[in-house]
């Protein structure tokens, strides 16, 4: 599933296609994403950036898919 998300860069907003995948390492087919609200999408990008350690969204997104799992994201959302 693809979702077009506006991402703020240093100069202006750019639409970025975000591919939503089942998290790596998750074998449970019932695992679902939260509702795709603006707030949840924003939290997902914030979490990706904390894993990336920089403002490069593409790099952060790749690290997110590699390192994160669904429970880690849920814990992050509950803490914020």
Swiss-Prot record:
Highest taxon of the source? Viruses
What this protein is called in its record is: Protein Vpy
Q: Which organism is it from?
A: Bovine immunodeficiency virus (strain R29) (BIV)
């Amino acid at each position: 599933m693809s979702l077009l998300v506006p991402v703020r860069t240093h100069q202006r907003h750019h639409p970025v296609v975000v591919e939503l995948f089942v998290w790596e390492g998750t074998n449970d087919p019932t695992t679902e994403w939260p509702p795709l609200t603006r707030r949840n999408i924003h939290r997902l990008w914030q979490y990706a950036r904390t894993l990336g350690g920089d403002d490069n969204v593409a790099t952060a997104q790749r690290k997110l898919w590699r390192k994160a799992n669904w429970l880690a994201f849920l814990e992050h959302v509950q803490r914020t």
